[in-house]
Amino acid sequence: MGSCIGKEDPPPGATSPVHTSSTLGRESLPSHPRIPSIGPIAASSSGNTIDKNQNISQSANFVALFQYDARTDDDLSFKKDDILEILNDTQGDWWFARHKATGRTGYIPSNYVAREKSIESQPWYFGKMRRIDAEKCLLHTLNEHGAFLVRDSESRQHDLSLSVRENDSVKHYRIRQLDHGGYFIARRRPFATLHDLIAHYQREADGLCVNLGAPCAKSEAPQTTTFTYDDQWEVDRRSVRLIRQIGAGQFGEVWEGRWNVNVPVAVKKLKAGTADPTDFLAEAQIMKKLRHPKLLSLYAVCTRDEPILIVTELMQENLLTFLQRRGRQCQMPQLVEISAQVAAGMAYLEEMNFIHRDLAARNILINNSLSVKIADFGLARILMKENEYEARTGARFPIKWTAPEAANYNRFTTKSDVWSFGILLTEIVTFGRLPYPGMTNAEVLQQVDAGYRMPCPAGCPVTLYDIMQQCWRSDPDKRPTFETLQWKLEDLFNLDSSEYKEASINF
């Protein structure tokens, strides 16, 4: 994969833009305090994003970046590219707007729109994005040779980066700003506006690896900060309709449903007596505040009557089912990428000092674009209130995924989650095989205490198995952090293809 941004400026006489092969970095993302003009019409003057904490002094036109379907009667539905007039932005992350074409008014999520003709409104602008994430986006099957995006530079605060797909690799170029205004990739070819620069390289490569083609596809709409503008955690269960059962587990059933008639949701229906409603509501309030692209969004609960209902966003299927049904269609880099996404979500929980306690493929959800989200984080602590004997015998306890200090002494920490993550990695590379095949829970406890670890699965790269072994160190303090696991797996995503080809023979 192409790119190493941050090299020296091209010399004044350079005849082509400078790009290099990729060295994936993990630098922190800098702020981008100003937006360049993209054409004859000036972009937003307030910075990279509109200040949502102030009134927009005059009504302003914004363009929809994604489709949004109203979730309540007070919301406003719109489609991508619709023009919306913002009337009031004092409601935090939900703004009151008028649809220019229909005249209808209602609340909209502010992160679904951008000021008309600003850089953020352009389909090729992706804002703050790491190089490795740009590469993953561009190499997605939705994109073809020549697909491109513009993002904020990781290493230079006021610069931008152009990322371009060339066949099955990605090249990166720095877009620099001139002191007197204007932009360039090669000094010999400056442009008055960013729009002019993009248009030029769409017409001809002129030193780039390829002519710019279609903007990179944005496959997912962003999460809204809350489910609705007037966010209610406890909702009337009459507003939740169950359509069909899509799963079941030790604590209850999972249903596809609708909230407020037309909003698709998943509904976890807990078995009666599973949890005390007061305790559950207190814990669920904490869980609801956890927001990350790789965590399943919790929308609402119904706790006033049995059974307790948990309303969440709807995903297509759980990872275990996906692996068993379609996992063999994936190449090793895709399996590693799935693992890295889980590590990213767990790194956020780690940062928030929140323990999952039941990390396994059955509790990871996935869609057709191979984007995953972690589910059921924290539920185990609320729901697993069994006696000590029942827990240790594994009646309602996932022994094969549980770290020895947690299974034996009930010591659950982020490091016990790391152990479980190592077990999850075996599920991923074996397409959903049960861990410790042929062994009972009691045998697993005994053998793991004696130092036994699962051998390297067939077809698994040695470097990936080494990560598993690090997760299974007896001393919890010597296990890696999820932040470390994330970048290790992201580096594996860029592993020499020869190892993947060799590993793929067993598929």
UniProtKB/Swiss-Prot annotation:
Lipidated residue numbers (N-myristoyl glycine): 2
Presence of keyword ATP-binding:
yes
Free-text tissue specificity from the UniProt record: Expressed in vulva, cells around anus and pharyngeal muscles.
Instruction: Enumerate the catalysed reactions.
Output: L-tyrosyl-[protein] + ATP = O-phospho-L-tyrosyl-[protein] + ADP + H(+)
Q: Does this UniProt record's set of keywords contain Repeat?
A: no
> GO MF terms on file?
ATP binding; metal ion binding; non-membrane spanning protein tyrosine kinase activity; signaling receptor binding
- Domain (Protein kinase) spans 240-494
Enzyme nomenclature, EC number: 2.7.10.2
Phosphotyrosine occurs at which residues? 500
| PROSITE patterns from the UniProt entry | PROTEIN_KINASE_ATP, PROTEIN_KINASE_DOM, PROTEIN_KINASE_TYR, SH2, SH3
Q: Where is each SH3 domain found?
A: 57-118
Sorted alphabetically, the keyword list is: ATP-binding, Kinase, Lipoprotein, Manganese, Metal-binding, Myristate, Nucleotide-binding, Phosphoprotein, SH2 domain, SH3 domain, Transferase, Tyrosine-protein kinase
Q: Name one GO biological process term.
A: nematode pharynx development
Name of the top EC class for this enzyme: transferase
Q: Where is the composition biased (Low complexity)?
A: 35-47
Enumerate the CDD domains for this protein.
PTKc_Frk_like (cd05068), SH2_Src_Src42 (cd10370), SH3_Src_like (cd11845)
Locate the active site. Answer: 358 (proton acceptor)
Q: Where does the record place the SH2 domain? A: 124-216
Domain of life where this protein originates:
Eukaryota
Q: Which cofactors does this protein require?
A: Mg(2+); Mn(2+)
- What does the sequence similarity comment in the record state about its family? Belongs to the protein kinase superfamily. Tyr protein kinase family. SRC subfamily.
PANTHER family noted in UniProt: TYROSINE-PROTEIN KINASE
Q: What role does this protein play? A: Non-receptor tyrosine-protein kinase which may play a role in larval and pharynx development. Unlike src-1, does not play a role in embryonic development.
What protein is this chain from?
Answer: Tyrosine protein-kinase src-2
What is the source species?
A: Caenorhabditis elegans
Lineage, uppermost ranks = Eukaryota, Metazoa, Ecdysozoa, Nematoda, Chromadorea
What gene is behind this protein? src-2
